[in-house]
């Protein structure tokens, strides 16, 4: 991290060349709904403007357009939606004329779903004839990407690196030439953008080494000791907050498909119907999502 500022120009030049050669693509994880924002629409459709309409999707596309203008090359953009928001998302992009992005470089695909269960292992019902499901988490994006035929399409187009980013952060830069160049120049097979935690209590996952291997520990998994642990210089030992902005080599992703990831179980508030068919909207966590 200390070398980035000193080598910024070199990294940017390397990354710019890779983008011009069509080796870099961006992939937006946008399967979520804006429920916590008080919206029943896809999270990316949420209007964050103060004096005019400005949408989350719009800001993300604007950020990517900055890279297009900087490098003079379009970056292939893949947008992962979910069963619950795909139609609204695609329609919104069409209505907004893709916010000025060349639609020939944009592909949508739908994330796999997983059932939701109660704490005692019973499957919830969303309706009388439909079990309750939710998107299967960020870790499932690549399987969905492959099943949609987009991995093969990307490889045929010459894509070697995919920058994964989430819909939540409108300030982030994706397909960042400096970020791309730093990974290529260092000979790394993957990379992550991080920000320093503002306080020990900040609710953000952290990037760290676990048994000598890069790992992410979610904020709710940090023990009290880990949260406040400091190094000799007084800085937090677990300070590198992840913002869900990763760069991967596409060949490595294909190789790793042979390895099954462990299921990450998360406690959530899950709306469902009870045995009498009445709608239940819990105020506290009542089950697991996977």
Task: Walk through the language-model features, giving the residues of each.
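N-terminal glycine-rich phosphate-binding loop and ensuing alpha1 helix
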Residues: 1-107, 115, 125-142, 150-152, ...
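Residue-level preference for alpha-helix termini and adjacent loops
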Residues: 23, 36, 44-47, 169-170, ...
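Beta-sheet entry/capping signal
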Residues: 23-27, 44, 74-79, 105-107, ...
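Residues immediately flanking
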Residues: 30-31, 167, 250
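Conserved beta-loop-beta/alpha segment of the NTase-like Rossmann-fold superfamily
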Residues: 98-99, 103-203
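Catalytic core of tubulin tyrosine ligase-like
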Residues: 154, 158-163, 171-175, 180-290
């Amino acid at each position: 991290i200390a070398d980035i500022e000193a080598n910024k120009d070199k990294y940017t030049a390397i990354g710019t060349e890779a983008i011009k050669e069509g080796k870099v693509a961006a992939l937006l994880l946008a399967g979520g709904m804006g429920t916590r924002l008080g919206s029943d629409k896809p999270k990316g459709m949420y209007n964050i403007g103060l004096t005019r309409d400005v949408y989350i999707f719009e800001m993300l596309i604007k950020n990517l357009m900055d890279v297009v203008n900087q490098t003079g090359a379009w970056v292939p953009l893949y947008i992962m939606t979910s069963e619950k928001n795909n139609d609204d998302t695609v329609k919104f992009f069409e209505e907004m004329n893709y916010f000025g992005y060349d639609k020939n470089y944009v592909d949508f695909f739908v994330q796999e779903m997983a059932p939701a269960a109660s704490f005692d292992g019973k499957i919830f019902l969303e309706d009388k004839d439909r079990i309750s499901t939710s998107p299967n988490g960020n870790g499932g994006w690549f399987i969905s990407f492959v099943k949609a035929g987009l991995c093969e399409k990307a490889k045929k187009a010459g894509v070697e690196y995919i920058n994964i980013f989430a819909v939540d952060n409108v300030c982030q830069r994706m397909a960042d030439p400096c970020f791309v160049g730093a990974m290529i120049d260092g000979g790394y097979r993957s990379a992550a953008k991080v920000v320093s935690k503002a306080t020990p209590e900040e609710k953000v996952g952290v990037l760290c080494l676990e048994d000598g291997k890069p790992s992410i520990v979610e904020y709710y998994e940090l023990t009290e000791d880990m949260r406040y642990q400091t190094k000799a210089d007084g800085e937090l030992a677990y300070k590198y907050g992840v913002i869900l902005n990763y760069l991967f080599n596409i060949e490595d992703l294909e190789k790793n498909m042979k390895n099954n990831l462990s299921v990450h179980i998360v406690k959530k508030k899950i709306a469902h119907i009870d045995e009498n068919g009445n709608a239940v909207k819990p105020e506290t966590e009542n089950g697991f999502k996977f």
